[in-house]
From Swiss-Prot:
Pathway: Phenylpropanoid metabolism; trans-cinnamate biosynthesis; trans-cinnamate from L-phenylalanine: step 1/1. This is Phenylalanine ammonia-lyase 4. This is a key enzyme of plant metabolism catalyzing the first reaction in the biosynthesis from L-phenylalanine of a wide variety of natural products based on the phenylpropane skeleton. The lineage of its organism: Eukaryota, Viridiplantae, Streptophyta, Embryophyta, Tracheophyta. Homotetramer.
Length: 707
């Protein structure tokens, strides 16, 4: 909605008085385009605050600090802020009765005082009711630094709109603290986000006023007193609060909405990652790509589903794995089910609604961080204070509860896909547990990781339970309904962290599967070559070099190799307890039984040559299998890795080359967790964003045409 601000009075000028059109307009375009915009804003060097244009990406950038984004205040906002501050002073001087200026607070607002400044100091004192635990070094009861920085940024943005009765100089001081990486210590718990985040925000006010119990953390993590913090930030002196200023600082939703902003920044990126990993899952599982066909999803109408399918379709379009899988399905259509299982086939239908929920929550929080959410509001143009309830953080609680449920659903899909990937009953020829070593009896691959994934998924599903239905009546039944916005944001932050753990484990497993497919292809080529050589030498050529009719058995024995999963026998390829040798023997016996007349002649008998065939194969095949493994380990495989011809390659390259991870085997000392840590830290630091978006750089925002 376009707004007109005349003399500090907002009026609707767009014909959209209820803001529904603006809300719908904000959802135009693809989710991926929105994520790209978010990332672009995250990487800007400066964030200019004016009150109405703050974005999720900007909040995440300032929250995570590191000197990357500096905060500037729009000078044009100064006049409106000053006008509301002066109105409060003039109102009090006239003797006008105003909530929180001349009255007590909440259920005790019947009390009156003319000591406006003292009242604000008392507000900050009694709200400093948080618990920090053993001391400044203990972080278990202290709000994380990024969350506090997000809260500071959002609160300044709100107050800049000029409806709160606070001096511009106080907002400048908070901005200096942000830009100098000085962060007040706020309690982790103690707010119900209605009437705003009173308790945690009071500690920011406490630092600004120099309360002796106030602490801050400096750029290097050092603990600072209020005096030390102000000196480092270049703020000359503590503030003596004027009437309404304490209330303006504490009576808002900035802590809950600030944390929600950083949470949703990550959640949106993880949602896109889940789409790309689902496509990679289809590649390594030799899936059938028709599950992404646009007509299927167009007929369902849901935009999230249509986009998820289109993204997966784009990744799979032209994929070398898909081309190879199509050949396999055509060669032996009965070798695998007609349809893939739900974790693959319905992944767009599953992910689509979750992405719609996360996107809607993102827009809801983006509106909240640009809202005026304290009480009372100062309307200078009408010369009045408006007593309302914008401090009620219900949009935060609802958005976070919904997002957490969506995050849990994404995690559930990852777990289902991961479970198929490590199970040799379902994974179309990959080894059990994705074991990459020579001896499966001494290599259990991702077995521990699968147990960990079950743990992550269980905790994530528990966290999906709502927070907002646990409201308790507070503050002498004045705050009898309250949003629990920050609590819900905190739980969603936990959920996002667990989804990062799951994404990490799953992505490393997908890269392991890619490498195993590469090894499988080279092994199969070597096995076919060895079997072909022995068949020619033993079965089709007589003692004098003459060809026998049994040469046709070569085609059949090679078909056995084609149809047998190479990892079902690769650790001991000539073992008669494994299917390869059993089936080769069976096919030769079948040939012998099919032609008794030929079998009567020892020169042409296939049956009499079975022993020689197996003996020669036992001499050649193990050497060939070992040769292929050595070449793979040395990076000299005859067949290149197919992943390089796929749009999912940037993710694989990032995990393998940039993070220096490798195929996990029982032969190496490196544990799975060591590799997972590398990827988890990269995801947490935002380093996965570029390779993820590189996978989709050629996508035009539309599905492949069905015409």
């Amino acid at each position: 909605m376009e707004l007109c601000n005349q003399n500090n009075h907002i009026t609707a000028v767009s014909g959209d008085p209820l803001n529904w059109n603006a809300t719908a307009e904000a959802l135009k375009g693809s989710h991926l385009d929105e994520v790209k915009r978010m990332v672009k804003e995250y990487r800007k060097e400066a964030v200019k605050l004016g009150g109405e244009t703050l974005t999720i990406g900007q909040v995440a950038a300032v929250a995570r600090g590191g000197g990357g984004s500096t905060v500037e205040l729009a000078e044009e906002a100064r006049a409106g802020v000053k006008a509301s501050s002066e109105w409060v002073m003039e109102s009090m001087n006239r003797g006008t009765d105003s909530y929180g200026v001349t009255t007590g607070f909440g259920a005790t607002s019947h009390r009156r005082t003319k000591q406006g400044g003292a009242l604000q100091n008392e507000l900050i004192r009694f709200l400093n009711a948080g618990i920090f635990g053993p001391g400044a070094g203990d972080t278990s009861h202290t709000l994380p630094k990024p969350t506090t920085r997000a809260a500071m940024l959002v609160r300044v943005n709100t107050l800049l709109q000029g409806y709160s009765g606070i001096r511009f100089e106080i907002l400048e001081a908070i901005t200096k603290l942000l830009n100098h990486e000085i962060t007040p210590c706020l309690p982790l718990r103690g707010t119900i986000t209605a009437s705003g985040d009173l308790v945690p925000l009071s500690y920011i006010a406490g630092l600004l006023t120099g309360r002796p119990n106030s602490k801050a953390v400096g750029p290097s993590g050092e603990t600072l007193t209020a005096s030390e913090a102000f000196k480092l930030a270049g703020v000359s002196s503590f503030f003596e609060l004027q009437p309404k200023e304490g209330l303006a600082l504490v009576n808002g939703t900035a802590v809950g909405s600030g944390l929600a902003s950083t949470v949703l920044f990550d959640a949106n990126i993880l949602a896109v990652l889940s789409e790309v990993m689902s496509a990679m899952f289809a590649e390594v599982m030799q899936g059938k790509p028709e599950f992404t066909d646009h007509l299927t999803h167009k007929l369902k109408h849901h935009p999230g589903q249509i986009e998820a399918a289109a993204i997966m379709e784009h990744i799979l379009d032209g994929s070398s794995y898909v081309k190879e899988a199509q050949l396999l399905h055509e060669m032996d259509p009965l070798q695998k089910p007609k349809q893939d299982r739900y974790a693959l086939r319905t992944s767009p239908q599953w992910l689509g609604p979750q992405i719609e929920v996360i996107r809607a929550a993102t827009k809801m929080i983006e509106r909240e961080i640009n809202s005026v959410n304290d009480n009372p509001l100062i309307d200078v143009s009408r010369n009045k204070a408006l007593h309302g309830g914008n401090f009620q953080g219900t949009p935060i609680g609802v958005a976070m509860d919904n997002s957490r449920l969506a995050i849990a659903s994404i995690g559930k899909l990852m777990f289902a896909q991961f479970s198929e990937l490590v199970n040799d009953f379902y994974n179309n020829g990959l080894p059990s547990n994705l074991s990459g070593g020579r001896n499966p009896s001494l290599d259990y691959g991702f077995k521990g990781a699968e147990i960990a994934m079950a743990s992550y998924c269980s905790e994530l599903q528990f966290l999906a339970n709502p927070v907002t239905n646990h409201v308790q009546s507070a503050e002498q039944h004045n705050q009898d309904v309250n949003s629990l916005g920050l609590i819900s944001s905190r739980k969603t932050a936990e959920a996002v962290d667990i989804l990062k753990l799951m994404s990490t484990t799953y992505l490393v497993a997908l890269c392991q599967a890619v490498d195993l497919r590469h090894l499988e292809e080279n092994l199969k080529k070597a096995v076919k070559s060895a079997v072909s050589q022995v068949a020619k030498r033993v079965l089709t050529v007589g003692a004098n070099g003459e060809l026998h009719p049994s040469r046709f058995t070569e085609r059949d024995v090679l078909q056995v190799v084609d149809r047998e999963y190479v990892f079902s026998y690769a650790d001991d390829p000539c073992s008669l307890t494994y299917p390869l040798m059993q089936k080769l023997r069976h096919i030769l016996v079948d040939h012998a039984l099919a032609d008794p007349e030929r079998e009567a002649n020892s020169a042409t008998s296939v049956f009499h040559k079975i022993g020689a065939f197996e003996a020669e194969l036992k001499l050649l095949l193990p050497k060939e299998v070992e040769r292929v493994r050595v070449e793979y380990e040395e990076g000299t495989s005859a067949i290149a890795n197919r992943i390089k011809e796929c749009r999912s390659y940037p993710l694989y390259r990032f995990v393998r080359d940039e993070l220096n991870t490798e195929l996990l085997t029982g032969e190496n000392v490196r544990s799975p967790g060591e590799e997972f840590d590398k990827v988890f830290l990269a995801i947490s630091d935002g380093k996965l964003i570029d390779p993820l978006l590189e996978c989709l750089k050629e996508w035009n925002g539309a599905p492949v045409s069905i015409c």
